[in-house]
UniProtKB/Swiss-Prot annotation:
Keywords: Acyltransferase, Amino-acid biosynthesis, Cytoplasm, Diaminopimelate biosynthesis, Lysine biosynthesis, Repeat, Transferase. Homotrimer. This is 2,3,4,5-tetrahydropyridine-2,6-dicarboxylate N-succinyltransferase. The lineage of its organism: Bacteria, Pseudomonadati, Pseudomonadota, Gammaproteobacteria, Alteromonadales. GO terms for molecular function: 2,3,4,5-tetrahydropyridine-2,6-dicarboxylate N-succinyltransferase activity; nucleotidyltransferase activity. Transmembrane segments: none annotated. It comes from Shewanella sp. (strain W3-18-1).
Amino acid sequence: MEALRQRIEAAFEARADITPSTVDANVRSDVQHVINMLDKGEVRVAEKIDGQWHVHQWLKKAVLLSFRIFDNAVIDGAETKYFDKVPLKFAEYDEARFKAEAIRVVPSATVRKGSFIGKNTVLMPSYVNLGAYVDEGTMVDTWATVGSCAQIGKNVHLSGGVGIGGVLEPLQAGPTIIEDNCFIGARSEIVEGVVVEEGSVISMGVYIGQSTRIYDRETGEVHYGRVPAGSVVVSGNLPSACGKYSLYAAIIVKKVDAKTRGKVGINELLRIVD
């Protein structure tokens, strides 16, 4: 794996000279191998080690290189055709493979090759970009978007219209991460490598980026880029120092309790894959 990493790093440094017609066959093979590993979940762009998230930048570089290496090709769709560099994940799936991987994909859901979808995951008409990792038991609801290289944990609910930011454009250092057992409310946007820690509930219409103040009303603390575990977050405002105006902020109103869990708990009837 280390040798592969070094070859990807070297190719990335020379990316300005790479085109689909001039790329070295070995570089093409290496990048395709990484995309295949990401697709199977054998590697992931970020993983939690000893309680801390670590980003494997070389895997992200391989994803970026794929856009330099692979040419556009016609992709067949149910009602139309597409023309893109990245094939669709499920293009060659049959009934047996869907059953073996225990996933449900509702018509018009789009998943690009190079993203991993865990068992017992339900994809409503949504979009999952390449390099993303969607773990087991997660629901990606209607019109939700999982951006490039984003990391979605187990038993997460991404409600309708949710946007989870990617890393490719604009180029971000680290992926957006939603940890296990989180609920992201409708039309909320979590971007720019923000980490929503385990068991948190984000209300409808909350927008969080790296510069967003995340204010804990119980403690007075202000967080940036991280929603502490078990937080219930709503959209709000904080006053300016001069008192003449207020600016948007995400407000931690409380910690998750039994009442909250009752409202956002997973409906097992909707997660039946068999």
